[in-house]
From Swiss-Prot:
UniProt keyword list: ANK repeat, Repeat
Organism per entry: Acanthamoeba polyphaga mimivirus
PROSITE patterns, sorted: ANK_REP_REGION, ANK_REPEAT
ANK repeats: 1-16, 17-46, 62-91, 93-121, 123-149, 154-183, 184-213, 215-243, 245-274
Leader peptide range in chain numbering: none
Pfam families: Ank_2, Ank_4
Name of the molecule in the record: Putative ankyrin repeat protein R777
SUPFAM superfamilies: Ankyrin repeat
Keyword Repeat among UniProt keywords: yes
Length: 305
């Protein structure tokens, strides 16, 4: 504090740059400094005058920046003090609460909801699902959060985001509450495959998830990511390795998944025209090793009786 007084004595303006000193003190949780600056009359509601980079808000302008950043970093004492002094907890569409949910600050979320923030906030719900904050999600649901939004066609639904991040506990919780995974039009199994959580894939399929939705996305993603055992599993569950005009092997070619390409060639039923198309596809990416293997495979087809 002596250093701040020193600079003030030398003519420093603690309110300059739109209350930047206060914003930084709040962001880093320095409550004593925050109180001192507020007592000096620094504006606690100051809006950023230009587009700022907060990645979760896509660079949009926000007000009550000090409160929002304190909430993001979990500084409950700073948040509660700023609210007491007149900061708006609901500013920028409950943005402080959303960030507190994203970063797992349960007590901050609870405080902000109790002070007027809307628990039924899609982005807070989705961020909880992505970041595996089950207790915060349960709290938001207890306060009226809707986990059944009209987004069955949308990869941005709560259940889809939980699957995409491999959050098994969150998925089980949502299913336990009645979220229907059998008629979700986005491919939840594909989401789980992308997260490499194969146990979650098995769970979803066992509970009725359709592996063929979204134009056979599950087997296509498994192929392009090189997950041979997962491709085998999906085939046992009724998937067709030749779906979408052999798109699975084409994606494997595009990603240079040589072992996957060899596996699909070994189990599939290809004619010379099919392989000629695959050769053209590989040539487009200038994958000489794959092109040569496909040419050999095509020659073997020609020599078959």
């Amino acid at each position: 504090m002596k250093l701040i007084d020193f600079y003030i004595d030398k003519g420093a303006d603690v309110s300059s740059e739109n209350s930047l000193c206060l914003k930084k003190a709040a962001e880093y949780g320095h409550l004593i400094v925050v109180k001192y600056l507020v007592d000096l009359g620094v504006d606690i509601i100051a809006k950023e005058p230009e587009r700022i980079y907060i990645k979760e808000n896509y660079g949009k302008i926000v007000d009550n920046y000090a409160l929002i950043m304190a909430a993001k970093n979990g500084h409950l004492d700073v948040v509660s003090y700023l609210v007491e002094k007149g900061a708006n907890p609901k500013s920028s569409k409950d943005y402080g609460m959303r960030l507190a949910a994203k970063y797992g600050h349960y007590e901050v979320v609870k405080f902000l909801v109790e002070n007027g923030c809307n628990a039924n906030c899609d982005r807070a719900i989705i961020w909880c699902c992505e970041e595996n904050h089950l207790e915060i999600l349960k709290y938001l649901v207890s306060k009226g959060a809707n986990i059944f939004p009209d987004t069955r066609n949308d990869e941005d639904s709560a259940i889809a985001r939980a699957c995409a991040f491999g959050r098994t506990e969150i998925v089980e919780y949502l299913v336990g509450l009645g979220v229907n995974i059998t008629d979700h039009n986005y491919n939840l199994a594909a989401c789980a495959i992308s997260s490499k959580n194969f146990d979650l894939v098995y769970y979803l399929v066992d509970h009725g998830a359709n592996i063929q939705t979204y134009d056979h996305l599950a087997i296509i993603w498994a192929s392009e990511l090189g997950f041979i055992d997962m491709v085998k599993y999906l085939i046992t569950k009724g998937e067709n390795i030749h779906c979408r005009n052999n798109y699975s092997i084409k994606r494997a070619i595009s990603r240079k998944k040589v072992d996957m390409i060899r596996y699909i060639l070994s189990i599939g039923t290809f004619d010379k025209q099919d392989v000629s198309e695959l050769i053209k596809h590989a040539e487009k990416y200038r994958y000489s090793e794959i092109v040569n293997e496909l040419k050999i495979f095509c020659l073997e087809l020609t020599n078959k009786p």
